[in-house]
Amino acid sequence: ITALTAVPMGLETVNSQDIKVYNVSSEEYLAGSKIIDDLTPETSYRVSFYSGDEQSSDTYQARIEVKTTVTENLDEDYGTANRIDLRNEAFDPDYFNKLDWNSLAEGTTFVLPAGKTYVLNSGETVIEFAHSVHFVTPQTLEDYPTFSFDNAFRIVEGGVVDKVTFKRINLRASKSLSEVADNSLSGKQVICPESDVFLINTIDFTNCYIENFRSIVRSKKATGNVGAIAFKECTINAIGNQGIVSTDGKNGNYINDVSFDECTITNICGIADLRNSSSGKSISITNTTFCYAPMENSFLFRVDPSIAVKIENCVFGGSMKIDGKLPKFNELGSGGQDDYTGVYPFSSVNSFQANDRTSSKGNLGLSDSKMSTATLFTA
């Protein structure tokens, strides 16, 4: 490839001034990357690729369609008063373990450097949130930073936290997937308060890669409450037997609203364990793809019938294989359970399943894609 062109889509007539041409050097071609920085935000473009001295039908190779995003404005999104920009600081992997979290101002925003790994809650350290806090990586073409969890974030006793934000971060357990011995995986969570009384209004995950947790958010105590948990454009892989979000059995705590939008989710034991009637109001799953979910013989949902479950524009592959209690990642299992009770009245909209996906209990109401899991996810 020696050049590419970008043309705004939707034009009735394309003039020469509408066509942007970018030469591709041999170094850029070998790296597989060409940086373009003069396109209009929130605009769809048709990008065509050429090999040759001119851009013509003879040198045309391929094309794709892309949509640009709004340039991020940290000042507008998070304000300026309580921002800590770690891009300007000497890197310390234990930085967050050394902070006095009680002294942080409400709504403190940590701006993270690309490509760095921070170790969290290691040794005797336990980070407890007392205020709203935001962890944000600005738009970047570099690798996202990583949070490596030895243990979960917690909330101070009696704490009221309005919002916790994770944006463009790799969230991983410090224990590697190769060390997993059973379906609890790392045995850890991202957020798991131990306090008897707490309230978190919103937990927001945006464009994060999340891997190897027993659960991502778990509310354990009968008087602990989480208002809303949102996953947007996240990739979630390898979540254990507590499910992506969960409360502790039939205790009276609740996780009120859970949403997934434009996510890719693989190798999970289950989505939600919210079995108490006061556990919540709704679960919304839209524009999301699942494969190797749930774990073989495990449940995708364990929710009280009073909780509304919305599934729209989603695709589901087959279950994840298990050997005894050991998950076999990316291997197709014999089938799982859509619903632990078998009686939840699911009503999916424009959502499909692989023809080798089976449920021994419950029915999501998915349409048959007439394709196997292998065909769907390798096409």
Predicted regions and their residues:
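Recognizes extended acidic, P/S/T-rich segments that occur
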Residues: 2-40
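Surface-exposed coil/turn segments at beta-strand junctions on protein surfaces, enriched
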Residues: 29, 38-42, 105, 128, ...
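Beta-strand-rich modules
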Residues: 36-55
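Extracellular fibronectin type III
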Residues: 53-73
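Alpha-helical linker/edge segments of TPR/alpha-solenoid repeat scaffolds
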Residues: 74-82
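Preference for solvent-exposed, low-hydrophobicity sequence contexts
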Residues: 85-86
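N-terminal extracellular ligand-recognition/capping segment immediately after the signal peptide
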Residues: 89-133, 140-152
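Extracellular beta-rich repeat passengers
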Residues: 125-127, 132-379
